């Protein structure tokens, strides 16, 4: 499934560290995304592809207790997110009671410094969204709450800059009878493919008006304003590369120039053309994804005849990055992050 050399190489691989990186390392990483700094990019690129896992097994962390991961388990998750922006966890001893499971998920997230939950309209009082087929109510008609395929995207691509989603957790309570597979790609791998093809493609996607999501009227009558911003940007709070993207053809407006159109086409080709570093996973009960808002999609699924046994995935979106140092469970946008970086 994946092509990199699984052996890490000295100085290059040392750019990838678990937990909170030092300011110097953060600076080295942000320098790598400067189109004028080719040496820094080449060093980072070598480290990334050398350290990148070759298959799903390299992403998996087994947990004994979802609510209380051990220091070693926590470290293993941070290491995988440090290298691939993603970890797959497996906890077969978790709670079966829905309320307890939701409490355990919050505790698990907090153990990894994920505390600032997005204030999503479909979330419960605890900030967790139940992704399941909804035939009525405010969720009806939205693709995530159907059994239809969900195209490639990053979470919260329609949010404004003050509510940018930096991380999310998907936890499987019940799988579908058939289908419901996720495909996942680290945005940094997409960045590498684009920049290696032509740095001008990256420049186009870093333009502050590269992608516009038009205004939308929510089911409760509230109007979500237009979101205009880049596809790739350096997050000023973390100095890490972040991405906002959707492969949808409706309700998305690309900047009207040849470079942006070419970049959008090439990016879609990466996602649909057999990229070897795309991971595919069909979560089983007790398994989940924890990531720094990676690109992902979902195949169509069938629940079978018993609706109460249908696919149920709990989703938590965070304004924090995995392993970040924020504190306090906030749901309001940060006024200091009210604009997209230029």
Which residues make up each language-model segment?
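Active-site environment of non-heme Fe oxygenases that use a 2-His-1-carboxylate facial triad
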Residues: 4-69, 80-82, 126-283, 288-289, ...
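Short amphipathic beta-strand starts and helix->beta connectors
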Residues: 70-76
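Long, mid-chain structured domain cores
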Residues: 82, 86-127
